[in-house]
Amino acid sequence: MDIIGGQHLRQMWDDLADVYGHKTALICESSGGVVNRYSYLELNQEINRTANLFYTLGIRKGDKVALHLDNCPEFIFCWFGLAKIGAIMVPINARLLREESAWILQNSQACLLVTSAQFYPMYQQIQQEDATQLRHICLTDVALPADDGVSSFTQLKNQQPATLCYAPPLSTDDTAEILFTSGTTSRPKGVVITHYNLRFAGYYSAWQCALRDDDVYLTVMPAFHIDCQCTAAMAAFSAGATFVLVEKYSARAFWGQVQKYRATITECIPMMIRTLMVQPPSANDRQHRLREVMFYLNLSEQEKDTFCERFGVRLLTSYGMTETIVGIIGDRPGDKRRWPSIGRAGFCYDAEIRDDHNRPLPAGEIGEICIKGVPGKTIFKEYFLNPKATAKVLEADGWLHTGDTGYRDEEGFFYFIDRRCNMIKRGGENVSCVELENIIATHPKIQDIVVVGIKDSIRDEAIKAFVVLNEGETLSEEEFFRFCEQNMAKFKVPSYLEIRKDLPRNCSGKIIRKNLK
């Protein structure tokens, strides 16, 4: 069933501009309080100018362009400007450091980068020291360094016409994005997302929260994440609603922003809910128009009840991952909700619990959560240049193995139990234990290392490192944490260190992580 009518993203934006014209499409608020507003007509024109900018820089259909940006209008311009000319966006987590960013550049084959002055020194170093295909950098800031191969994004964009100059043939099967996501291996994998995936995500996520064109969808989620793109932005635009993109989350500012923009829908992760709850009570706590708060794992029933009672909101649970594009299991609009269930499978999806032999399990039995969709349409197409990893999780008939455990009840409600092996959920970010262990193992004083997630009252899980030192060595906490801060993104740095004489292992020599939690 083709529910998108064969429409790729270029056609979507041309139609939205015609239908909604001067209606507000996008509002962006920077950390400094600067607010930019665009109507559907104006936003489509900015997208066209950006597409023309890329064309003048030699970008053609199939080329990859990396974005290393915080939440800003330029991210939206680039995302859809690239899609209009058949080029491919490669968003990079804005919190990654040099080594991690360089690896994504190398493995995505990106030939152009759009970033800000904040991140430029890192990429200048990457160009000098790492082998990449990067040939040009566009900076979104006004002031430019006197370097070759660097241009002003804004200056070049504003020189372009508002009508599209290059419009190659497009198909909904064309790749629109490669989104690198942390996995249980030491390196992230590039999730290939098509035009169809994004168009479907818009319709599906709009259905999930019964979105209308008079709604205002506000998010503080980072634009480089799938939930901001597919649960929020694509849903809002597909419904002709207003999308509000806030640059950075602030617990003190959040409710003021919800009230200021008269938001009717927003999305939260547990870290946000917990930090909002520790703010001083205010008479304005319930002075808002929110009817739904899209919510992603994991919260206790007491936390949920306290939050909903204090702020007068409803949580609409949604379960998914980058590979599923949207929240494929979740609460439905107008349907009953059964906490702590994560909901039921949405339309166009089947869901099962399977055992270790890939056999379906009956209600009440615990196993792996598996999802059936259509690759390249309702679930991701593949991992970029990684057929082995693709085959490991995606069956030929469209069944996707999530690696998460859970069970379902007799009425089809699913319940999540635990995260996939070796993953830590920290304040909305997925962190691979293996990746951290490989980095920490390079410290000259460390003989053995294991990293685990432990419960954290604010950020879901904190990261704890257990290390065995080389004989005769000593290691202070200060030295250890300084080493980590210099070699990994801040959100990956462990919070705790424990030095041990040995680590628990099973008979095959594998570390028994559960004994350390």
Swiss-Prot record:
EC annotation from Swiss-Prot or TrEMBL: 6.2.1.48
| Signal sequence annotation | none
Superkingdom of origin: Bacteria
| Alphabetical list of Gene3D superfamilies matching this protein | 3.30.300.30, N-terminal domain of ligase-like
Family annotation (Pfam families)? AMP-binding, AMP-binding_C
Provide the alphabetized UniProt keywords: Ligase
Report which reactions are catalysed by this protein. Answer: 4-(trimethylamino)butanoate + ATP + CoA = 4-(trimethylamino)butanoyl-CoA + AMP + diphosphate; crotonobetaine + ATP + CoA = crotonobetainyl-CoA + AMP + diphosphate; (R)-carnitine + ATP + CoA = (R)-carnitinyl-CoA + AMP + diphosphate
Q: In which pathway does it act?
A: Amine and polyamine metabolism; carnitine metabolism
Q: Which NCBIfam families match?
A: PRK08008.1 (NF005947)
Q: Provide the family line.
A: Belongs to the ATP-dependent AMP-binding enzyme family.
What is the name attached to this protein's record?
Answer: Crotonobetaine/carnitine--CoA ligase
| Gene from which the chain derives | caiC
